[in-house]
Amino acid sequence: MYVLTSPVGDYFKSGAKPLRLLLEEDGMRCAPHMGMIKSGGNYASALGPILRARKECDADQILFCPNGDVQETGAANFILIDGNEIITKALDSSFLHGITRDSILTLARDMGMTVTERNFTVDELIERAKKPGTEAALSGTAAVLTSVGTLI
C-alpha cells in the first residue's frame, strides 16, 4: 500500500473565516436522481450559480434548497447544530452521501449528541438560526468541516 500526501490550501477563499451562504430555492445542484453520484457534471452544474452568487451577493457558496427543501452546497453537505442536536438532510438520491458527513455524524452520536437526519425547510433553518448558540457548517472531503457565519 502507498500513501501519497501533498500540501493543499484552504478549499474556501475565506480560510478559517465563517462562510457566507446564499440560500437558493429555485435551482438544484444536479438532477434529483443523480445527486448521489460523484461526477464532474454534478459539480459543474453548480459553478454558474456559485459564480453569480459570489459576484452579486459576495457569497462564498450557494446552499441549494429547491422548493424550500434544504439540501447541500455545490461541493459540501450542510449540517445545522442546535444545542445538542445535529440536523442534516436524510439520505436520498438528490444529494451526495458524503463520507465526511457520515464520519461527523458517527462522532457526534458517540459523543452523546442527538443526530436527526430528516428533511427540513428554509423557514425552519432561518427560525433556528435566530436562536443564540445555533451553528451551521459544511462538510466534505475538501471542505472538511467549515463553519457558516451568514445566511443570505
Regions found by a protein language model. Name each.
Residues 2-152:
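Helix-start/capping segments and mature chain N-termini
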